[in-house]
Amino acid sequence: MTMPITVPFVGFTQAELQSFRNASVPDLVGPRLKLLFVGINPGLWTAATQTHFAHPGNRFYPALRLAGIIDRDLDRGRPMTEADRAYFVERGIGITNLVNRATARASELAAAELLAGRTRLEEFVALHQPIVVAIAGVTAYRVAFAVPKATEGEQPVELMGARVWVVPNPSGLNAHQTITSLAQAYAEPAKVAGVIT
């Protein structure tokens, strides 16, 4: 039996990454959506791989694994496989962004883009009807939803019938969080959504 040859994935050059500036990334969503994670916007690595939260330094997938939301490791930095995408859909987990425009840093977004992202998110939630929406990033939430004093955790409002949580951003740039603290924050909305018990 011949074994396939695997070529190590070494990443992207800065020029390659910059070529993905302003690109979009398709939403990961399917029927029977329970828990919708909402990123701020795609990073350049995410746009290059067409995989949400894909930067090698992003702690999203390790935190989901530690929380028991997923039961497999995903190879950060590589494109998500079709089997991985199907696994998320089967679990009732979806991923979208407030703004679907790739930048090197979320701080490159204008406030108007975040406000428009709220409208897009409302339409998305109305269409897909998740039980819980978990928005990853309190600063972006404050701007997009015009709630300047919002804190992380469950919010006192619903979004098109879905309960809303603000959870910490898993970016490696968010030095205040660890994989353990992210896992704890992500487990709470996952329990309410019925993804974990």
Question: What are the language-model segments listed below?
Answer:
Residues 46-112:
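Short, surface-exposed acidic-centric catalytic microdomains
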Residues 47, 63, 143-144, 176:
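Residues that scaffold the ATP/ADP-binding catalytic core of kinase and kinase-like folds
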Residues 30-40:
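Short, hydrophobic/glycine-enriched beta-strand segments
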Residues 41-45, 100-103, 139-141, 170-173:
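Short, solvent-exposed loop/turn segments at secondary-structure junctions
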Residues 1-26, 30-31, 55-56, 105-120, ...:
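C-terminal capping/extension of enzyme domains
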Residues 90-147:
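Internal catalytic-core helix/loop-beta-alpha segment
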Residues 33-35, 92-93, 162-163:
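Structural motif
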